[in-house]
Structures are given as structure tokens and as C-alpha cells.
Amino acid sequence: MSASSRPAFGVRRALAGIAAAVVAMATFAPAPAMATMDPEPPVITGAPYVGSTLTVSWDPYAYKGCGAGAGPDTRIYWTRDGEVATDHPTWPNYVLGEEDRGKTIAAHLVANYPCENMEVASEETAPISASHRPSGFTSRSAFELLARRSDGALMMYPRINNTWEPARTVGVGWNIFPTVLSPGDFDGDGNNDVLGRDSAGGLYLYSGDGAGGWTGPRKVGTGWNIFTALVSPGDFNSDGTNDVLARDANGVLYLYPGDGHGGWLPRSVAGQGWNALNTIITPGDFDGDTNVDVLARDSAGSLKLYRGNGAGGWNGMSVVGQGWNGLSKIGSAGDINGDGNFDVFAVDGSGQLKAYYGNGKGGWNGSGVVGWGWGGFTDLF
């Protein structure tokens, strides 16, 4: 499936194909009246990542079955790559698991007897990718910001329903790493992980345990100190596994595809001239086309959106902000305000933590201050 032909997904409508309803006429009896011959297609919400929940909704009165005055009369089932997902209940919600990674999911609505021939199915989703960074670290699909203190303590700040939960310490000694980042689930166990690069260039994987802690570490690379920036965009080439982008001193940007088991596939060049940008962040799908994107700030303070094409490359660039050079830290860790769109956080010179709310179309839907005293952290991710 090409990037251009993949259905729009996330917090938007999944187009549906309509199967015509067929009602047999009983002998010596009038044909029962169909309430709706062409019901509206169902709508699927949710992100196509392991750990996310897909929800199907529809107008129940468009599926009234047969007979005068018949009420809502439907049942639901889900398919995985066209086969009935018998391991999932026939409910409107579908929690995506590791068994769904790389597969496509569809929801089916069937009118119960006597209209058993009436069935409407949504189009299949894009292939499900590994759990991504915005899903958090405690298996709740919550916004959970990691902050490293100068003493090396790693703190987690969960935020649910626009309210911060109490911070908790999830690690010590993390000041040995000049660079830390979260690629999402990098080893294929369904839990989100963290990568740390030490001063000698060793790259270490800390596997998440799904409860806000870590198992490991284990070394997954050497020589990574040749890079001036490391970020994880998520699944940048749409193969179902999470990846890393690395920029060298010459400004060459490399894509290191993850193999889904804590290792790597062969790298490729993803861009040139990226040393003109002093900050690179990875907000996920920022423009609503199902492909993950990259935001980058230049020395003049312009914030640029580089749209991913879903195949390890780009689909154009646009400027989405000015004046961002007044912010000491910029990053993205998911959906801060719970509206279904990915956002950007930033710390200003006074230590205020600001949220810049994405509109799901490559732009903004306002901003707000969501915290104070954040200037003392050496890293936020």
C-alpha cells in the first residue's frame, strides 16, 4: 500500500465500503420494510500503534434491521488482515497488541436476524506499528514526560486529564549519558524503551517493563559518538518497527531502521545539510497523513516541519513557527491535552514549561503554560 493511498487515520474518519442489504420476500406475505438501504459508514478513532485503542462508532438508528418499528439491531466483529480476530471480543473497542503489529484492522457491523445479509465494513487501517513514544511507559497510553536532573536522577511526570500526577523517580545515574531518547518499543515486547549514548559512543538499550521501570541495560551499538544529534521519529519507513535518525558533523542525516528485536537493519541516508538546524524533535504524525514527521529549529528561530513520506524520506517542508530561539529546550512526548493530536513542549528562560497544541493538520491550536521550575533539568524527553 503506498503512502498516498493509505486511509486517513488517528482522530478522523475511516472511509467505508457499503454492501447492499438483501431481504428475501416471504411467501404470501408482504416484504418487510428496510429502515435504511445505505447506512452511513462507521467511524474509527484511535492511533495505529500497539498499545492504542481503536473505537468504532456509528448511528445505531441507521441499522434498524427489518420490519416496521424495528429498533437498533447490530453486532460487531473485527478482522486482522481480512481474517476474523477471534481473540478479540465483539465490542466497539479494540486494544491493539503485539499480534497486530504489521497487520491491518477493520471493523464490521452486521444486522442481526432477519437481516443477516446486511453488513458494512470499514476500510482496513494502515499497518499497525510498534508502540510509539506517546504511549508512555506505564501501559496507560498516558502523556508521561521524562526529565533528567543534574545529579543523574531520571524523573517521570505523568499527565492525565490535563492534570499532573505526582512525579516519581524511575532511575539514577543517568548523567553518564550525554544523550538519552526514547524510541518507543524497540525490542518488540510491547513496552516502550529508552536509549542512552555514553561519552565513548556506546549505545545502550534500557527495555521498559510496562510499569515505569526498566530491565537491562544491554549494548546495541558502538561508535555513536560521531553523531551530533540522535532522535527517534517512531516508525519512519512504515515497516512496523521503530527507528532512529542520526546526524553527523557534516550535516548528513542517516536513518537507522530498527529490526523490532533491539537491533538494526542497514542504514540509509535520509538527508543532507541538517547541520543548519540546532534542534531536531520528533512529534510523530503531526499533519494527519499517517506518516511520522520531524520538526527542526534553525539559528534564526524558525521552526520547520519536515513531512515524512512513510518510506524513509520526505514529502516537503514548511515553516510552522517563528521566534522559537527564545526557548531553551524543545521536545515532543505525545498528546499533552488529550485532544488526540500530538503536541510540542518547550521551556523558556524563566523555567516555564509551555505546551504548544498541535491541530492535527501541521499547525497549531493555541498554547499554554503547564508548569513552572523546569529550567533545572539537563534533559527532557
Q: What are these regions, as identified by a protein language model?
A:
Residues 1-2, 119, 265, 315:
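Intrinsic disorder/low-complexity segments
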Residues 3, 10-29, 34-133:
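Ser/Thr/Pro/Gly-rich low-complexity disordered regions
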Residues 131-381:
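Trp/Gly-enriched beta-strand/coil motifs that build multi-repeat beta-propeller-like domains
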